[in-house]
């Protein structure tokens, strides 16, 4: 597990992206944004199935997109983006006011 302070700062930066930037949630829309070359960073939850994770890594490698592995599960990632449901993967298209692209990648 990541230290609590760094995990909280990541959650804050992610919340700022949700408020001011553009993003997509979920596997299908993330793969679509990766194939179109629109994604700048993808965040994958820790409990994502191995096959799905490897497919996301493959598409990210093809589109030269950075990958960040979130320390919590999909419940925690859903809470971090302010949703009341589980989120396995988040694709950040535009960071907005956040410096998450330089910090995480």
From Swiss-Prot:
It is found in: Cytoplasm. SUPFAM superfamilies: L30e-like. It holds the Pfam family Ribosomal_L7Ae. GO terms for cellular component: cytoplasm; cytosol; cytosolic large ribosomal subunit. Its main location: cytoplasm. InterPro entries: Ribosomal_eL30-like (IPR039109), Ribosomal_eL30-like_sf (IPR029064), Ribosomal_eL30_CS (IPR022991), Ribosomal_eL8/eL30/eS12/Gad45 (IPR004038). GO terms for molecular function: pre-mRNA 5'-splice site binding; RNA binding; structural constituent of ribosome. Gene3D superfamilies: 3.30.1330.30. There is a cross-link at residues 22, 53, 83 (Glycyl lysine isopeptide (Lys-Gly) (interchain with G-Cter in ubiquitin)). One of its GO terms (biological process) is cytoplasmic translation. Keywords: Cytoplasm, Isopeptide bond, Ribonucleoprotein, Ribosomal protein, Ubl conjugation. Signal peptide: none annotated. PANTHER family: RIBOSOMAL PROTEIN L30 (PTHR11449). Component of the ribosome, a large ribonucleoprotein complex responsible for the synthesis of proteins in the cell. The small ribosomal subunit (SSU) binds messenger RNAs (mRNAs) and translates the encoded message by selecting cognate aminoacyl-transfer RNA (tRNA) molecules. The large subunit (LSU) contains the ribosomal catalytic site termed the peptidyl transferase center (PTC), which catalyzes the formation of peptide bonds, thereby polymerizing the amino acids delivered by tRNAs into a polypeptide chain. Component of the large ribosomal subunit (LSU). Mature yeast ribosomes consist of a small (40S) and a large (60S) subunit. The 40S small subunit contains 1 molecule of ribosomal RNA (18S rRNA) and 33 different proteins (encoded by 57 genes). The large 60S subunit contains 3 rRNA molecules (25S, 5.8S and 5S rRNA) and 46 different proteins (encoded by 81 genes). Present with 59300 molecules/cell in log phase SD medium. Belongs to the eukaryotic ribosomal protein eL30 family. This is Large ribosomal subunit protein eL30. It comes from Saccharomyces cerevisiae (strain ATCC 204508 / S288c) (Baker's yeast). The gene is RPL30.
